[in-house]
């Protein structure tokens, strides 16, 4: 990625984050297939995961969701991009989507280095990058943006380490139509 694309992405993320924090985003709610959106996000990153020969395990239940489709694409693109970025070559990324009675749960796991305990509390802060992440492209805005979008939908996001290495992100979103963005 060249410097102009990175700068454009940075400016776009700063503006979007600012709008979210000031609640200046028009709430364009539509019903769409969340599983298809996640699948599209993953396929749009195909160049990155094929370059590293990363495999995938994908179990996405069919889920119709009402929310701001454009904003939600930022969630999946950022989480998937990070999973690819921090996964070792020939690693595996696992993603699961399931619908509960009152919520939808998305789980994304990778085989990367995981997250140090002192970092877990700060990874959703603006401009925060863990020491080891400076080797990879990024600006410390992606997860902050993801958190603001999830929060504005009345959902939750958490990051945890997997028992045998790697990281797990869990996003839970309410399915009540009046609470989704």
PLM region spans:
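Short alpha-helical segment of the dimerization/phosphotransfer core of two-component systems
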Residues: 2-7
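Short beta-strand/loop element within the Bergerat-fold HATPase_c
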Residues: 90-102
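Conserved glycine-rich
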Residues: 154-155
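Short conserved segments within the C-terminal catalytic ATPase subdomain
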Residues: 48-57
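Short helix-loop "hinge" at the ATP-lid/N-box region of the Bergerat-fold HATPase_c
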Residues: 83-84
